[in-house]
Amino acid sequence: MLQPQILTARQQQELNKAIIQYIKPIAEEANDGDLIQKLSESLDVPLGSIDDSVIPNYLEKKWSTVLRLQHKIIDLEGEVSNLRTVIDSQQIVPSASASVIGKDKINWLPSSSIKAFKTQSHQLVQSVSIHPALPIILGGCSDGSLIIWNLVNDESLIPEKIIKAHIRGVNTIAWSKKPVDLSGKGSEAKGIAHVMATCSSDLSIKIWDGATFKHIRTLTGHEHTISSIVFSASKPNILYSVSRDKSVKVWDLVNGYCIKTFIGHSDWVRDIDVISVNSNLLQEQSDINPELGDFLVTCSNDQSIRLSHAESGTGLSLSIGHTHVIECVKFLPFHSNYIIDKYIKENESLFPNISPEVLDDPNYTNLLGYKYCISGGRDNSVKLWLLPPPVFRPHRHPLPSQLNNSQGWLIADLVGHQSWVKSLHIHPNGRFVFSGSDDKTIKIWDLSSLNVNGRVKCVKNLIGHEGFVNDIEFASFEITNNIHASKTADDGKTKTEEDRRNELMKSIESKIRCLFISGGVDNCIRLWS
């Protein structure tokens, strides 16, 4: 029985000619003229009609075109899926819920751009920052300039100061988490102030007085572009940096020396974040061991996220799941754990490799200070990870985790961006995640939506930039000893976890500053309200 024809008569004729055109040079090279003659007769194609009417290399071009179209179809299907996810998430959040989000200060979210601070045409904004105590914003530009605006000036759109900080682009601007005494006379000395640091593609880190913006000293030692810097969470005079030379360096700002270098990645290290059990934003404040110091999380072009112990440089775990370069990574604050722990416990079947003992491990609280992190990369995704606890031995630094082959557990994918995710930031309440992307948008994700259906929803989509969004920042606030949640009430009764969390949120709400900025390649820093 003959199979029905898929091609028309004309298409069949073109295919037959293309087959002979493809086979002919192969047969001639093999001195097999009879093959071509028989093929011509079988396909009813005169040999003289091929060269005139058939495009050269017709069969190969058809084949490669089909492959390209298949790849394009796959890409378009993925894009449609992402758009459906965004639309669904926006439709699922009811208006009543939206009003609750913006109702109180602790849940304040930006919604529209109210000011645009312009730079010159050759000054693409690569990094942004907000002064930790004053209404001052800063932008680091591609020409090495550091531009400073004061938000309370009458002419706030005019820069208060422009500093030629570096000879190449300013990649990161970082502030000390507490005032720093660089004189070495002790942190209790009067007159000390916050310190600012900038890093650049010119292979240098520069330290600046946070009050006067005068240059204090320059740190050198990296052999390639310095991607990111962050101040220690437990020692104000310590700075960490990562570079394209694959290394992580630890700097003592009092004397300007590099006191430690370690390499944990096989390619360009893009970003770094730090956390410590000494943080005053923990829900538990008893029985902590400050001796372990800081823990670092770094991400790289090698598509991995590495958790390290800062003092020893020991790698404790790797988180692998991104399919392209990872641009940014952040620890989640400890008060985010309540939201994510609840989701995992309510959906145990989705995480068969995560035992209840891991989720309830007291070492996260008493010794480590970290539990979850998020990452964003060039695969257009933001990923949420549970980091495994390390192994502890008496009188030794922490050792690599023995759980899950020393790898982090992927908890959720935040899907919605159409291009590279370049920057991440965490809302002070620990509930919302901000992501800036090359698709010109900033998305706000609600981690509490994990408790609904296991998918993190995008609750807001900030549109205003006309080019790639390179950096975003939510204003920090001073962390003091009274920002914590104790275990017991005044009457001696033990507080519930919910009570401690509510107390912590009230403490944060009293300090929070509702300022959010972003910077991009459209020569603009935007202030959102």
Swiss-Prot record:
SMART domains: WD40. Residues 68-89 form a coiled coil. CDD domains: WD40. Signal peptide: none annotated. WD repeats lie at residues 120-159, 165-218, 221-261, 264-318, 321-395, 416-455, 496-529. SUPFAM superfamilies: Lissencephaly-1 protein (Lis-1, PAF-AH alpha) N-terminal domain, WD40 repeat-like. One of its GO terms (cellular component) is spindle pole. PROSITE patterns: WD_REPEATS_1, WD_REPEATS_2, WD_REPEATS_REGION. Keywords: Cell cycle, Cell division, Coiled coil, Cytoplasm, Cytoskeleton, Microtubule, Mitosis, Repeat, Transport, WD repeat. It comes from the Eukaryota. The keyword Repeat applies. Its main location: cytoplasm. It is found in: Cytoplasm, Cytoskeleton; Cytoplasm, Cytoskeleton, Spindle pole. One of its GO terms (biological process) is cell division. Pfam families: WD40 (PF00400). GO terms for molecular function: dynein complex binding. HAMAP family: lis1 (MF_03141). Self-associates. Interacts with NDL1 and dynein. Belongs to the WD repeat LIS1/nudF family. Positively regulates the activity of the minus-end directed microtubule motor protein dynein. Plays a central role in positioning the mitotic spindle at the bud neck during cell division. Targets cytoplasmic dynein to microtubule plus ends, thereby promoting dynein-mediated microtubule sliding along the bud cortex and consequently the movement of the mitotic spindle to the bud neck. This is Nuclear distribution protein PAC1. The gene is PAC1.
